[in-house]
Amino acid sequence: MTPFLRQQLSRQALRLAEIDAALADPKVCSQIGTLRSLNREHARVSALVDRWQRYEQREQDLAGAQELLDEPEMAELARAEIGAAQADLDRLDSELLTALMPRDADDDRNAFVEIRAGTGGEESALFAADLARMYLRHAERRGWKTELMSESVSDLGGYKDVVLHIIGDAVFEALKYESGGHRVQRVPATEAQGRIHTSACTVAVLAEADEAEEVSLNPAELRIDTYRASGAGGQHINKTDSAVRVTHLPTGLVAECQDDRSQHRNKARALAVLAARLRDRVRQEQAAKDAAARKSLIGSGDRSDRIRTYNFPQGRLTDHRINLTLYKLGAVLEGDLDEVIGALQAAHAAEQLAELETQA
């Protein structure tokens, strides 16, 4: 481990003491947003400090065992301890490097996942429904909660567009790399000749704004329209103007919700989606600036980036950003995204590490 990284890890103990002092301050405890943020940081930093202390202890154990190699009666025991200590150090070294990487401030947030059908007509809408189901199944595997915020259903039961609200531990951290263009290659249900078609959808993953969020929605800049809900929901929902569409006039961003019978709840949900879209707009602008300075391997999350292909005839999934190919398409579409997400996170961590080491 480099002296620079050791210095960074040693500083974490000082930061932990600062957080403990802040959490003991009654003024800080009265500020819910600050308290929540500090508690999250405390959990992360305390785990990092604990690993660093174990690393230092195992270094001492290794040095002690190496000194015993010259004593014949202790040599065999020393060699066993050296092997165990080195294995622990290698594992802790990897864990510490990962934990030391700069974290996205939005990683701990819930997320909205917006899926829009693109090229391919009805087949694209059916693929959008497949993607929505994939994310819902993955959320179920992780123990996350989900809500359907809005949907526009196609003639064959696909989605022209759909917005999912996914709630749980570090949802955005796991799903943020899903933003971009998703392409499918398969024989559509509507294809009589058995020919393979290519269709596409776009996915946008937006971090949810906190209740006491920095995004302020000026009522004077909002146009709120109500209309009669369409689609599933029964007779009652179609007899009232319960659906709500909110337009942010300065940017033209729109959010709508029609899936609750209560106009008030639909409005609250639409405003939550709009706040997330405004935050994402700022995030995308910053990402564009960063991209001008350096080219990220996994991309910026730009919706125009084609990130992944799902090839049904071959049972193949290919993530083009990291040249990852898996022949387990069925499992992935059933929500088994862990290997894909893990590979993307590892690629991002490797980029960050390379950047961090240049600062040493």
From Swiss-Prot:
One of its GO terms (molecular function) is translation release factor activity, codon specific. SUPFAM superfamilies: Release factor. Methylated by PrmC. Methylation increases the termination efficiency of RF1. Its main location: cytoplasm. Transmembrane segments: none annotated. InterPro entries: PCRF (IPR005139), Pep_chain_release_fac_I (IPR000352), Pep_chain_release_fac_I_sf (IPR045853), Prokaryotic/Mito_RF (IPR050057), RF-1 (IPR004373). Keywords: Cytoplasm, Methylation, Protein biosynthesis. Gene3D superfamilies: 3.30.160.20, 3.30.70.1660, 6.10.140.1950. Disulfide bonds: none annotated. Belongs to the prokaryotic/mitochondrial release factor family. This is Peptide chain release factor 1. The gene is prfA.
